[in-house]
């Protein structure tokens, strides 16, 4: 019996749901949506445009979007205890691209964890860092502690005086020694960015580290990993200059 295309799509969609209902997936970049979130994602809003910001849309008829987005912004500011939140990104990588666009210019120097040491691919020359045309310098790595070598990284930041200092990884076991490294970055005039995509739920729950209180000027993240929501991303800052 040959299934037509639509039937095959429905079958595979149902099979995917069964897989997650009857197993415990351990993929860090995935999670399970609540029935309430599924209801919102399956609504008519899912297929509508809502370009712009609440109250300043390019399309008419976006009042429902405005209400929902304003609630989301207020909730994000409350959960992460920050002055600014943008929840429009379609992923953590898109949030990183937006942050790099705002905080750097082509040719600027950025420091980050190498992909070999657990850094996210968007932090690499082949990812968002390269798309922005930045000069990448990676941190010396402490293999035993599985974190940036603090003393060597402090020297690297002071010697290179990067425009932007980036922390956060897609593979890591422990909080980043952020406060000390951020202090050194600010001493040389660098902005500090923290990619919290893979640990954002732990940060929100107060059981990891608190990047915005430990020196990060901007924190990005995903809304669908340890923070269990639909596919999307965050831009967060406690800076009074964030808009």
Segments the model singles out, each with a brief description of its role:
Residues 6-7, 34-35, 58-66, 154, ...:
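Short, structured coil/loop segments at alpha-helix boundaries
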